[in-house]
Amino acid sequence: MSDQLQMTDGMHIIVEALKQNNIDTIYGVVGIPVTDMARHAQAEGIRYIGFRHEQSAGYAAAASGFLTQKPGICLTVSAPGFLNGLTALANATVNGFPMIMISGSSDRAIVDLQQGDYEELDQMNAAKPYAKAAFRVNQPQDLGIALARAIRVSVSGRPGGVYLDLPANVLAATMEKDEALTTIVKVENPSPALLPCPKSVTSAISLLAKAERPLIILGKGAAYSQADEQLREFIESTQIPFLPMSMAKGILEDTHPLSAAAARSFALANADVVMLVGARLNWLLAHGKKGWAADTQFIQLDIEPQEIDSNRPIAVPVVGDIASSMQGMLAELKQNTFTTPLVWRDILNIHKQQNAQKMHEKLSTDTQPLNYFNALSAVRDVLRENQDIYLVNEGANTLDNARNIIDMYKPRRRLDCGTWGVMGIGMGYAIGASVTSGSPVVAIEGDSAFGFSGMEIETICRYNLPVTIVIFNNGGIYRGDGVALSGAGAPSPTDLLHHARYDKLMDAFRGVGYNVTTTDELRHALTTGIQSRKPTIINVVIDPAAGTESGHITKLNPKQVAGN
């Protein structure tokens, strides 16, 4: 009996390794061969959050990674469960969120000979194109070092998703307990500072000082860096206007006088020097081409050197982590002080005021049914009084309009579809943000977007999370007034069920539901949902004719030679 007590197995080893590396939460869906691993993690004090679908579990893990700078852990079963989680792993990698997906897998000896094992799949090689790295463990004594490598890879350099493959026979393999403990590695300084070249920093300050119309663009890499105070000090010292990308909103409050968000198009078209801080010149910024001046000069602060010159020539690359780079910029600024020309700030303010007036007219229009603008105006009123909440946002028109209308006041409080524009992140991100922060979360969802992960409301209710889900329901993908070209009475490809009552879903799970048709009802329901800290769905009835095809990115749809 005493000899048996001194033995351990792979699943106990991996849990102990997680514990020693201060991993306190696992998001997942259990089944063969990982159920007992989740049970043991709970027994060891690691919080396990069980989901209804692996994709949402992965999104929750990724959101946790973005908010904490520690890898979020997603646990899945083999093959189908692994594939369900793979979208979330790829999304984490594309967006630069640290995440580790741990999946059970089948016996390698059978899989490699394709002999038809239970849920047979070569998962490691399937994961490689979509992850920053993928590792498979073939013997229990390597579990500790494998997890250590996964942690370091996920958070060092540009963060991303890492896949860790744990075959069932490795989870069940035994080792002498004392020996097993010696194989566990506690990762030290997993994400060391990467200092920029001093000459690059000097050149960046010199170019900004000469600029007549400088602009700073803050990306979600800047938000992830948590260099909030350095960024604020630099912007306020130089008086350079800034433009936040959607998940960078709140690094400086959206109401800050130097925010150029309300004059975005004018600022991009007229800036002569643009400093990108943790932002990429990808499709979200028209690759730095359409809508930009041809002679704009770019400074780019990024941790990934391969990102430099990806679409436009970068006059001054500053390669390093954002916090170290901004520290260097501030130090150099003390030696070479400058202030942005007032005329540039004044002309931006004129355009901001003009656009704000146009938006005010849209927001103040009273319609029945509601449209996106007056409904979001009501949401904005409530969230202005609840600035600590975390906001999750997905959809087409719901996303695009909410991004422009709802102000953020604190960093890393907004989570949305990100670089990929992926739908289905809503409930996973909301759960991840709630579990990580303990704060109330408001998820503003298009009705189509909500459908991708809607069953996770059971997860929200099971854990009694303070999540309020606001569903903008216009009965369709983009809009709900599509016409079926077949003429046979079938729904159009973009139609959903009209007059759906999403609020009644909460009856099944003992949550709270509201159906609202006016702005006053919406304000009351949202305020009550936040203050009660109870799982809540608010079904907001929106005009089916409100919205546009694909929201603000209609132009990305291919043009037909012959229209239908």
Could you say what each language-model-derived stretch is?
Residues 2-5, 141, 295-395, 519-528, ...:
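Phosphate/pyrophosphate-binding active-site segments
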Residues 2-339, 382, 466-469, 501, ...:
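N-terminal alpha/beta PP-like core and its mobile active-site loop of ThDP/TPP-dependent enzymes
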